Amino acid sequence: INYYENNKYCKKNIHILIDIIMKIPQLEKKPEIKSCHNTTWEDNYSWIHQTDILEVLKDSSKLLPDVRKYLEEENAYTDYHLKNTKDIQKKLFDEIKGRIKLDDESLPYRDHSYDYWTKTTTKGNYSIKLRKKIDSNEIEEIWNGDKEKEKLNVEYFGVGDLEVSNNDRYLGFSLDIKGSEYYTIYIRDIKTNKIITKEITETTGGITFSLDDKYIFYSKLDENHRARKIFRHEIGNFEKKDELIFEEKSEAFSVSISLSSDEKYYFINTSDHN
């Protein structure tokens, strides 16, 4: 390919020559007869549709081998054609990144006995959550995303929610480490740094503490990635003992739970995507 790129005669038709040398990825045709409303047609590519696509989101190894192979070929082909733009890609990336203040802090907000705020640094990719007692100058770090990712040793690390209990003792956090948007909830004792509740799986990520801080409320995702159930979890107990407190029967709606600003009421919201 380098020969053709440097040859004056071939330079005009370099893309045609590359297509010959580096075969354009072709998705295999597997004809299948479809019919609907008295109309019949042949679909060559319906085979790539996986009925268990949500399972693939949870575990990428379940992707059809032929589909994976085709996607990898497409990526390789694209990378080759865009290799001459790597410098401009980096330049654009650096320019956009340069407009973001990486070393930054949010304004503090007061919650019960503490002031809370977050900060980011030039060295880290994730935020740090800090707090200090209202009558103290001692700053306490209760969450560091980069350290948490390092402990888990994962490639993907998505943070869903960070919530502190009303008694300021517990930190509830939810993580997606697969990119599936199914979040796992954990409860940590801030003082001892020990995990009290190890895993509540396949949730939306939202965490709401009860006023007595004995429980949390959360929404569970079903196999179709819909949040139709709200559970109550006793902190320190096992997920299998969680109590279902609300279920939306309509598949068109999703549910969530939140606490009113005066902390007197819990709201269960059910709505469609509109």
Language-model region placement:
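Beta-propeller folds
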Residues: 21-274
